[in-house]
Design a protein with these regions (language model features):
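Basic, nucleic-acid-interacting segments
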Residues: 1-169
Length: 169
């Protein structure tokens, strides 16, 4: 219900533009992030459902990039020490049983929404809605074990069913 590192509400879809922001979302000097405990719990639940190892230590990294969709100039993400790693998901596609290895399940914060405006003349410009910035984003990273579109569909269908069952999605 809240963003990844602050208490702003995460229901940005129907909210007025830039109404779900705070100094933490904007990365203003002197602000400190506080982790969303529920997002961590959901990620660990997902990892366990995928047979992942849950390490005792994890960390978040600061991924720097200068794009306009992230006001602070960096994204808080995980890479080398995720919340869950080394899992698998067994699927059936085209009558064949397959195992898709899951490299990791990690958390990061989503970026802002860009809206490109082009009225047909030379005043084309982009608008930034920061409401989505900081919303928890869980990523499931699989190994390249899927060989056909049918296997990819079976993988995503089963993963979606698991996330729905857990109440994570």
């Amino acid at each position: 219900q809240s963003k990844m590192f602050c208490s702003c509400r995460a229901d940005y879809q129907t909210a007025p533009v830039n109404s779900r922001v705070c100094p933490v979302c904007l990365g203003l000097p002197g602000t400190l992030p506080v982790i969303n405990k529920k997002a961590v719990e959901f990620t660990i639940m997902t990892g366990l459902a995928l047979g992942c190892e849950i390490p005792e230590l994890t960390k978040f990294d600061r991924k720097n990039y200068p794009y306009p969709d992230l006001m602070k100039g960096y994204q808080i993400s995980q890479y080398d020490m995720p919340l869950a790693m080394n899992g698998q998901l067994d699927i059936t596609a085209d009558g064949q049983d397959r195992r898709v290895r899951v490299e990791r399940v990690h958390l990061e914060e989503d970026v802002s929404k860009l809206q490109h405006v082009n009225s047909g003349n030379s005043d084309a410009h982009s608008l930034v809605d920061v409401n989505r910035s900081g919303v928890p984003l869980m990523e499931v990273v699989s190994h390249p074990d899927m060989r056909t579109p049918e296997e990819a569909r079976a993988y995503l269908t089963k993963l979606h069913a698991i996330l729905q069952y857990l109440g994570v999605s």
